[in-house]
Amino acid sequence: METIVLGVEPRVIKKKNAEKLRKNGIVPGVIYHKGEETIAISVNELALRKLVHSAESHIIDLQFPDGKIKRSFIKDVQFHPVTDRIIHTDFQLFSAEEIIELEVPVAVSGESAGVEKGGKLLIILHALTIKGKPEDMPDHLVVDVTALEIGHSIHVKEIPLDAYTGLQIMDDPDTPVITVLASKKEAEATPEAAVATAS
């Protein structure tokens, strides 16, 4: 997994200060670690947005003005309900041997058999919560959809982790991750396809 350096600055926790920061393109946030005091920080909105909307997960080295670096990952992001701008973010620190839970993006591999027959591929879960050591975390989880037919789904429990050592998916095993839906034209031509449920 790639490590990204992100500049941050300490901040004073006040509502008016947070609003002023946001108006100037700065996002307020906090850094926390079990057993340690929470640190209030601010980070550039554009730099943070690139990480949040990336197709890959990252380890983040938070760099302070004095040069100190704290290794972390993004634990939570809050968005404005109307503008969808990032308004707050939580970073969690960790040690090399610590077991963490990290959201890892899902990447699709192969051409679905159902898509070749006119179906539409739908990714239901764009990221999965993975538990393991930071050094073992992948940039993304590759899911092969080659055999996926119309009306069928790939569930969490069907995603193999053979290529990843010591990792565990924490999401509900029965949750569908990817499915193939019948296209409107296909559904009209084949009534059974219209009522097919993800199985």
Swiss-Prot record:
Entry keyword Cell inner membrane: no
Record keywords: Ribonucleoprotein, Ribosomal protein, RNA-binding, rRNA-binding
Pfam families linked: Ribosomal_L25p, Ribosomal_TL5_C
Domain of life according to the entry: Bacteria
Tagged with keyword Nucleotide-binding: no
GO cellular component terms attached to this protein's record: cytosolic large ribosomal subunit
Protein name: Large ribosomal subunit protein bL25
Listed GO MF terms: 5S rRNA binding; structural constituent of ribosome
Single Gene Ontology BP annotation: translation
Record's function text: This is one of the proteins that binds to the 5S RNA in the ribosome where it forms part of the central protuberance.
Subunit structure: Part of the 50S ribosomal subunit; part of the 5S rRNA/L5/L18/L25 subcomplex. Contacts the 5S rRNA. Binds to the 5S rRNA independently of L5 and L18.
Annotated CDD domains: Ribosomal_L25_TL5_CTC
